[in-house]
Amino acid sequence: MRLLLAFMACAAAAATPDWSAADANGRLAGEALSRSRRVMHAWLNLADPVTGLLPRMENNPNWVVRDSAADLYPFMVIASAFLERPVYDGSMHHILRQEMLLTRRAGHLSDDLQPGGKGFVRPELVMDEVMFGSSEYMKDGLLPITEILGETPWYFRMRDIADDMLRLAPYKWRGGRLPAQTAEINGNALQVLARLSWKTRDPRYLDQLIAIADFYFLHQLPATGYLPAHEWDLATDSPRRGVFVFSDHGNEIVGGLTEAVMLTRALRPEKAKQWETPLKKLLDRLLETGRNADGVWVHSVDVATGKVVAPRHAHCWGYMFNAIYTGYLLTGEPRYKQAVEHAMDAVVKNPNYLFDEAGAGRKWGANAYSDSIEGALVLLNRLPHPRLSAALDEAMKKYYARQRDNGIVEYWYGDGNYIRSAMMYAFYKSQGAALAPYDERVRLGAVREGDAVALLVSAGAPWQGVLRFDVARHREHWNMAQNYPRLNEWPEWFTVEPGRLYEVTVNGAEPQRMFGFELRKGLPLSVPGGRQARVEIR
């Protein structure tokens, strides 16, 4: 009996949430959200009074599609959706309206615009530029909005652009049409087409995805030793730029190809079977040629020889490991998972991989933080790593310190990525939960233990509202068969399933039994100023 009582006491103690950790997480999340809101307002103040659109940077007032539309504006949309709904319903929808009215040049494809009603930046239509900017807008901007918010006007904007990307794709090879000759644009297109195919099951998207993926898996890669060329010359059927870039502006093709295999395995398995061997050869060749001694990606290698061209590490190291981990999910090959784990260990040992103040950071500033932080969070979602999580907390302190008193970070479009990474980090610390309405004087932090989550609301002022929970967005927003790691996703943490039964305890009161569809309406809370509310959900 004594042993049984001791066991029960230990079990009860183990089940007690670590409220001090939840409080610490709430402070970290609260700062991330507050800083994100300040960036949003600082850039809204810089909008052109005539067009309503946002500048590229302090000394370039143009709305540049690949930058202003892709990397700045979308994350202001996401910030406003969670932190200030009147701004979301007002300014953010207004910018979308103006962008659609003023920047469409080739069907629904967008081009760069001067401020003050002066018209397009380029007097003549340059299709390669329009295709590049529009592909970036979709992949880096409209995809992440849809990942986290679901079916909004920005989703339909992406659909329109994608439809005209198919219709106007300017290049042909024997297997179909291509939007570009570059790995970046084709990789962007594959990622967009994969997710639209999951969601809509529209065969046009799937057919175009297959045409692009066939070009790489069955045509280009066998000719290059399974390293994609940065740029291919269709006229000579040979590399125009024979390097492969492991950093962004190059690595997009690998993520796109792994997404293509994941998609076709579910929707067109005979095609996925055809790509299995080329996929393995691609992933193996990348791991063989592209890692430094620590197991982290270099910047670029020569396609013909596999020799390193630029040895500096890729600051967005996690992006390529998303693809390697997806390869693990597709093949079951343990070496792919081990490569990801090895890289996570290396990042802990050398904090410069999270941000290199003397290297990549000198060129890219805060954006070098953003790409690394995002990659770490996506991988942490699949492979918990307490030491990497702690290293990320330290990196965030440096990241926060880059923001100026007026809310601006660095006066260029990369400030939008500051919002993205800060909010993604905040959701990590709150396990995907959020307070509605948002009040920066009220903090929310969480700790997780298996299927249970403990959430602590700390009110610096009286607050009344609801606690909202995340859902399985990969399934509900995209209709995906599996939640594989992918570029520009927002990781899912504690998600609420409609038909599942939950035990909910608020401030130690008698537990309530609630179904997920009830929790999805939001858990009502009222917290006096200077007090806390403790919520446990199992």
Describe each PLM feature range.
Residues 14-537:
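Glycan-recognition and catalytic cores of secretory/periplasmic carbohydrate-active enzymes
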Residues 1-7:
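Sec-dependent signal peptide recognition
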